[in-house]
Amino acid sequence: LPKTTSVENVELPLMYNPAISAKERFDRSVKALQRVGLGDRLYHKSNQMSGGQMQRVAIARALVNNPSVLLADEATGNLDTRTSFEILTLFQELHADGMTIIFVTHNPEIASYSSRTITLRDGLVRADKQNDNILSAAETLKTLPVPKDE
């Protein structure tokens, strides 16, 4: 949402719940942004953030209601490799904290970072397998080059 700050953007889902005060809405939004690594970008607008940061705002917006399941549809689809692995690392951390994440991707390599892979084709389940050798996105991230501006 181009005209809102990160914190305003994340507050939006809570606006529909009259039981949540403005202070609680703000506090929960700040906590969600901190959880995704954007505690220092609370008042930045989308034109002041990278694609990866905007994706993190979207994830924080999904987390602000404390869901038991998070649906991430092509969450790394339009991101560069390094940013994709930053997002995957975040998802693995959320999963380690007990959150169920349904991660939709067209990239089979990305699926090796999940605990279970369900392959669909033409709307039908073609494969359903547990991954006994889950790769660590954080470890892969350490091997990727850091951009010169960081």
Residue ranges and their predicted role:
Residues L1-Y113, T117:
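ABC family nucleotide-binding domain
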Residues T89, T119-R121, L135-S136:
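Glycine-rich, phosphate-binding/catalytic loops in enzymes
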